[in-house]
């Protein structure tokens, strides 16, 4: 079983059968422990992307309500670390990515499940450690 931190693309892929990442997500979700982590901004992004998916947003929030997905907020406690990540990576990193990298620093035994291989292969924990990733 995998202890996971979920990115937007992986979540949307799991909940939308028409999404390009559905096969990836549906293959790997059975391996993920029931308590996956994500951050609040990923929920906002996924909710927006699932707007036109029948029951997509409802199923997303059901995962939160049932405890299958634990949503963490990194602000205000981790604002200094998030700011440092955003400064380090500049325009390449958005706020959601910075939050996920910070969660990976805090929850060191979790794997980030993402479809964004381009950026997450560049990001580092503590500026030097490659992130543990599960990607397509």
Can you name each region flagged by the protein language model?
Residues 1-19:
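Metal-dependent nucleic-acid phosphoesterase active-site entry motif
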Residues 9-10, 41, 77, 118:
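Alpha-helix/helix-capping structural signal
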Residues 71-115:
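Active-site neighborhoods of divalent-metal-dependent phosphate/nucleic-acid chemistry enzymes
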Residues 5-6, 24-52, 66, 71-74:
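PIN/NYN-family metal-dependent endoribonuclease catalytic core
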Residues 1-3, 106-136:
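Acidic, PIN/NYN-like endoribonuclease modules and their adjacent C-terminal/linker elements
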Residues 8, 17, 59, 64-65, ...:
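Terminal helix-to-tail segments of small alpha-helical proteins
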Residues 14-15, 49, 123:
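Residues that scaffold the ATP/ADP-binding catalytic core of kinase and kinase-like folds
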Residues 12, 44-47, 83:
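Amphipathic alpha-helical segments within well-ordered protein domains
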């Amino acid at each position: 079983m995998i202890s996971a931190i979920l990115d937007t693309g992986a979540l949307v892929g799991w909940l939308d059968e028409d999404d390009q990442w559905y096969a990836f997500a549906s293959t790997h979700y059975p391996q993920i422990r029931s308590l996956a982590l994500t951050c609040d901004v990923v929920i906002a992004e996924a909710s927006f992307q699932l707007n036109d998916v029948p029951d997509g947003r409802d199923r997303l929030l059901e995962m939160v309500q049932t405890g299958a997905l634990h949503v963490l907020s990194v602000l205000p406690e981790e604002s200094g670390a998030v700011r440092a990540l955003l400064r380090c990576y500049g325009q390449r990193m958005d706020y959601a990515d910075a939050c996920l990298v910070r969660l990976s620093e805090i929850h060191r035994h979790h794997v980030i499940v993402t479809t964004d291989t381009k950026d997450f292969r560049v990001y580092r924990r503590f500026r030097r450690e490659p992130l543990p990733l599960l990607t397509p």
